[in-house]
Amino acid sequence: MTKIRNFAALIDTTLIQTKMNIPANLKYTNDDEWIRLEGEEAYVGITDYAQHELGDITFVDVDPDIVGETLDAQEEFGAIEAVKTTAELLMPVAGEILEVNEALADEENAKLVNSDPYGEAWIIKIKVNDVAELDGLLDAAAYEAKIG
């Protein structure tokens, strides 16, 4: 399997993209991850576009021992494996890992990333160090423009 730095490396610009689900209440990274803020805590996952580009998800690899660690923005916190490739998961903002969605480590449940990327397939829950850091992320319109 090829390991890639981010999901954007999978894009074939010669293909016409289908309409992707891009909820307006989320913020997005250039690495095709989303973050949903709830107070000072936030849920993080990969976008509908990312799961579509990756194909069938087989495993979400986030060590549960990471809970309690504080990571910087763009620091790797895990990986996601698909039939096509493996991709790194990067922190969208700095924060403390509060919870890992361990259900996704099961191959059957990992498929939730394909069917429900913004719901049951959240990957980690974090305590955001600085909520203002989200201002540097993409809103839904900017993310939609990015993926074309």
Show which residues each predicted segment covers:
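Short, positively charged and aromatic/hydrophobic N-terminal segments
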Residues: 3-16
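Generic structural signal for buried aliphatic residues
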Residues: 71, 77-78, 97-98
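Short, charged beta-turn/beta-strand-edge "cap" motif at the junction between a beta-strand
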Residues: 76-78, 83-85, 103-104
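Structural motif
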Residues: 41, 94-96
